UniProtKB/Swiss-Prot annotation:
This is Tegument protein UL47 homolog. GO terms for biological process: regulation of DNA-templated transcription. Residues 8-17 have a biased composition (Basic residues). Belongs to the alphaherpesvirinae HHV-1 UL47 family. Phosphorylated by US3. This phosphorylation is required for proper nuclear localization. The lineage of its organism: Viruses, Duplodnaviria, Heunggongvirae, Peploviricota, Herviviricetes. The nuclear export signal is CRM1-dependent. Keywords: Host cytoplasm, Host nucleus, Virion, Virion tegument. Tegument protein that can bind to various RNA transcripts. Plays a role in the attenuation of selective viral and cellular mRNA degradation by modulating the activity of host shutoff RNase UL41/VHS. Also plays a role in the primary envelopment of virions in the perinuclear space, probably by interacting with two nuclear egress proteins UL31 and UL34. It comes from Psittacid herpesvirus 1 (isolate Amazon parrot/-/97-0001/1997). It holds the Pfam family Herpes_UL47. Residues 1-75 are annotated as: Disordered. Its main location: virion. Interacts with US3 kinase. Interacts with UL31 and UL34; these interactions seem important for efficient virion nuclear egress. Interacts with UL41/VHS.
């Protein structure tokens, strides 16, 4: 929510040390300036009973295998014990896999008139980035009028200049969509080819997540054995090679699914469809679903959900570009952008965790159906069969800390980040609620539901989850490139959590069938070209301490959803590592990024 030229609020807190965090104490809201709660480090969480039971994985709710009690006797992958039915090579697991992997029939064929209607609906949305939310290959983009080429940057301020936001939206569209606009003209992809790509990408992503569980099992077993021995045992920190094995959220449901297992010699980042059409879609970035032909075939519910995600991220991407210089000049030694970078880094870590949570929920839902199929009760309705990712206790604990920290920062970018996060996190929950309601209605019909009928419901949910994951993956790459460029080229010193970088590195691998990450070199070159072509030159200006906001600025207001999520800090124990200087964190994890800050990646052509 934004208001023009509202009266300014006082800056609630300035964080000068990395070890301090704004939070809620003793279950009651305290004045923001009095908040002094340190980051809860993983090494300092003690022997909390819930965490000892694997609270961050929530095995009781998800009915998964407890990672802290993993022994050969109850490990289905270390013995011949079968769970949830017989999962032989030709058993129900393979049968289920064949149905899931069969060509989806959930995207309708549409004509140009329906596409034009969808494009008009999308672009008619009132937004502070209008009219630059248009599809860059459409008529409305080609007829755009002139705009300010000299936006003003207010570093780490409570307001953003309206023109700077529009320029940011323009640059974001050009940088992130130009390649797909050109590739689309050359390859002319169709709705059917897009559906086939999404179907194959979904199954490959499930293979990646499932196989990662198995490949990390030896590390998890070693950590579990060390814990049981009790001798000088400490929980792994994000710098430990075993940390991700313990801290990832992917659970198997105690079954062997041959169709989901990758050969041991196949790296998960190479499990991607090849060919020119797949390369176009994998390299499309945000443009894939900004393209109206990709949204028009969706059903009405999915159209609304996808539009909501695109609108929210359009504003945030524009706000990010409007908050920092387009060309860093490190010799100036300007540190006034570091507070806004601190906010972006905190949001980045939270958004990475949310994306991993949603991907884990999609894997969980897929395996849940397979397990019920093997047990022969797939046509029995169970309200808790498909877990809501928004009710993940690990996520809610971290939300309380991170959103409270963003809310206390007092910068416009922090508010936009918090509002965008609150909007994005509820969308997969809506899709899951719809799946559960439709599943219940299908099982109450007079006729017995067929396996294909119920799989169709799961496919509809999987379609939206896949779209959501694709857009979030491209957004996280965008945020990562902005942060890396600020630390490396801008010499900005701001804190970031190492755990966020490790999780993001793994997410890039897991989601490689959907998205090819953009290297920093490609990102910087595209941004430089867009700014040069439009002759954009920014000016940095401080906000004067008066009773009025500068003319032409926008003040964003925290949404009610953000305030509700902040209260989760009181209910759940957050598990977080201490932030560290960003430049050192990127150097530590850079090898895991495949050197992507130095050079490009294989674009999958």
């Amino acid at each position: 929510m934004a208001t023009d030229n509202a009266r300014p609020r006082s800056r609630s807190l300035r964080r000068k040390s990395m070890g301090a965090e704004a939070a809620l104490r003793d279950g009651a809201a305290q004045p923001a300036a009095a908040h002094k709660t340190k980051v809860i480090a993983r090494s300092e969480t003690g022997d909390d009973a819930d965490e000892d039971a694997g609270a961050d994985r929530d095995p009781g709710t998800r009915r998964g295998i407890d990672p802290w009690k993993l022994e050969p006797a109850n490990d289905p992958f270390a013995s011949n014990k079968e769970y949830g039915g017989k999962w032989g090579a030709n058993g129900p697991a393979d049968s289920a896999a064949k149905v899931l992997a069969a060509a989806w029939d959930i995207m309708a064929l549409v004509d140009a008139e329906e596409v034009a209607k969808e494009q008009e609906t999308f672009e008619a949305k009132t937004s502070p980035v209008s009219p630059f939310g248009a599809w860059p290959g459409g008529q409305s983009w080609r007829t755009l009028g002139d705009y300010s080429h000299a936006p003003i940057l207010y570093p780490s301020a409570e307001v953003i200049e309206a023109d700077a936001l529009k320029v940011g939206a323009y640059v974001s569209r050009v940088v992130q969509c130009s390649r797909f606009v050109a590739d689309k003209k050359a390859q002319r992809p169709t709705v059917r080819s897009l559906q086939s790509f999404l179907e194959a990408a979904f199954w490959r992503v499930m293979q990646n997540a499932y196989s990662t569980c198995l490949r990390l099992r030896p590390k998890l077993t070693a950590v579990s054995r060390s814990r049981r021995s009790g001798a000088n045992w400490r929980k792994p920190s994000p710098s430990d090679p075993n940390w991700y094995a313990v801290s990832n959220q992917f659970l198997w449901r105690g079954m062997r699914v041959p169709s989901l297992l990758l050969p041991p010699d196949v790296p998960i980042e190479e499990n991607a469809e090849r060919g020119p059409t797949a390369a176009v879609f994998r390299n499309a970035g945000p443009a894939l679903f900004i393209w109206p032909w990709a949204r028009a075939p969706l059903d009405e519910r999915d159209k609304r959900l996808v539009r909501a995600a695109l609108w929210a991220l359009d504003i945030l991407d524009a706000a990010i570009l409007a908050s920092f210089p387009y060309a860093w000049r490190p010799h100036v030694g300007d540190k006034q952008f570091e507070e806004a970078l601190d906010c972006l880094a905190e949001y980045f870590g939270l958004a990475v965790l949310l994306t991993e949570t949603v991907l884990a929920a999609l894997l969980d839902h897929t395996l849940a159906f397979m397990k019920s199929l093997g047990a022969g009760n797939y046509d029995d309705f169970e309200e808790d069969r498909f877990a809501d990712p928004g009710k993940n206790k690990y996520l809610m604990g971290v939300e309380g800390v991170s959103l409270t920290r963003l809310n206390s920062a007092g910068t416009a970018l922090a508010t936009v980040c918090a509002n965008t996060y609150a909007a994005l996190r509820c969308l997969p929950s809506v899709a899951t609620s719809s799946l559960t309601a439709n599943y219940s209605a299908e099982t109450r019909r007079a006729r017995k539901p067929t396996r294909e009928d119920l799989f169709s419901l799961l496919q509809h949910e999987a379609l939206f989850y896949t779209i959501w994951l694709q857009r979030m993956a491209t957004h996280l790459d965008f945020c990562s490139n902005v942060l890396v460029e600020s630390a490396k080229k801008g010499k900005q010193e701001f804190p970031i959590r190492r755990s966020a970088l490790v999780r993001h590195m793994w997410l890039q691998k897991l989601l490689s069938p959907l998205v090819v990450p953009v290297s920093l070199r490609d990102f910087a070159a595209a941004k430089k070209e867009a700014v040069a072509d439009a002759k954009i030159e920014t000016y940095v200006k401080s906000v004067q301490s008066t009773n009025k906001d500068p003319k032409g600025t926008i003040r964003f207001i925290a949404s009610d959803n953000v305030k509700t999520l902040m209260a989760s800090y009181e209910k759940y124990n957050p598990i977080l590592d201490e932030p560290m200087i960003a430049s050192r964190a990127f150097d530590d994890v850079i090898s895991g990024y495949g050197g992507r800050t130095a050079g490009g990646q294989n674009r999958g052509d």
